[in-house]
Amino acid sequence: EIAQCLVGSEMCIRDSTWSACKGVVSCAAGIALDEGLIRLDEKIVDIFPEYAPENPEGYLGDVTLENMLTMTTGLESSLFFCDWPERYTTPDWIRYFFENAKVIKKPGTEWLYSNFNTYMISCAIEKRAGVNLLEYLRNRFFEPLGIGNPDWTLCPKGHVHAANGLYVNIDEFTRYGQMILHKGNYNGKQLVPESYMKMATSNLVDNSAAGSPGNLYSGFGYGYQFVMNPEAGSYRSDGNYGQFCLAFPDKDAVVTVMSLEGDFQKIGNHLWTTVVPEL
C-alpha cells in the first residue's frame, strides 16, 4: 500500500476526489442491484416517466442503466457539468437531461464520457431508495470504511452531484482503494457484492478515444465507472487535478494520490514511469 498526500497538508484534510468518486456511484449501483432497487437492463425513461418525453427521439428510449454505467449511452455530446455556465442557470438537472440529451447512436455501441451518466444513475438509486445517495451509502458503505460524515456537493434539487463533488482525505481514499482491490470486501465485510465488483472492474468496453499522445495510462478499457490500467487485471478511479486510486490485485497493492495539479497527466505519467514499476 502506497499513499501519497498533498505536499504541506495534513492527512486529515479533506479535498475533492473529482471524478474518482464515480467508482463510489458504481459501488452504490452494485448495492442497489443486490437489494432489488434497480436492474441493469432498466431503461432510464421508465425510471423517470414524469420527465421522459412521450415519444423519445433517437435512441433515448433504449438507454439502460448499464449503458450509463459503461458510458455507452450513445450521446451526441457530454452535456454540461461542474463549472459549465449551464450549471448556474439550470434548476432541474434531470429535466435538462431529458430535454437536451440527443442519443444519436445505438446505446452500447460507442463510449463517450459524460458526467450526466453518473448523475442519472445516482438519481435513479435515490428515487428508488427514497433518500439521497449520501444517506443511502452512509451505513452501507461509508461508515464500514471509516469515512464518517463525508461531504458531497448537491445540485439545486438536492441530489448529489455523483460524478464529482465527494470530499475525503487521502487515508479515506486509500481505504476505498483497499475495498475495490478486494472486490468490495473491507476488513472481512462484503460491502458490495463480489460478483458485481468483478464485472464492474472488468474491461467491458473500448475507450481508446480517451487516449491521447503522450498519455501512458489512458484508453485501455472501461468497466462500470472504473477505468482500466495498462496492466492486465488492474484498474482505477481517477479524477481531475491528479486524483488517482490505483488497484493492482496481482500485486496486492493500492496507490493513492490526491493533488491540485492542473497538468494531471504529468502525475499519471510519473506514476507509470516511477511508482508502478517498483510495485
Residue spans of the language-model regions?
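Soluble non-cytosolic domains of exported or imported proteins
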Residues: 15, 19, 23, 38, ...
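Structured C-terminal helix/loop/strand segments within mature extracytoplasmic catalytic/sensor domains
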Residues: 237-279
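Single conserved hydrophobic/aromatic residue that forms the stacking wall/gate
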Residues: 1-8, 13
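A small/polar active-site loop signature that marks catalytic segments
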Residues: 74-154
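Active-site SXXK
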Residues: 16-41, 68, 121-125, 173-179
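Active-site-proximal alpha-helical segments within enzyme catalytic domains
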Residues: 117-124, 164-185, 243-259
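Active-site helix/loop module of the DD-peptidase/beta-lactamase fold
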Residues: 35-73, 102, 129-164, 168
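Active-site Gly/Thr loop motif
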Residues: 147-149, 198-254
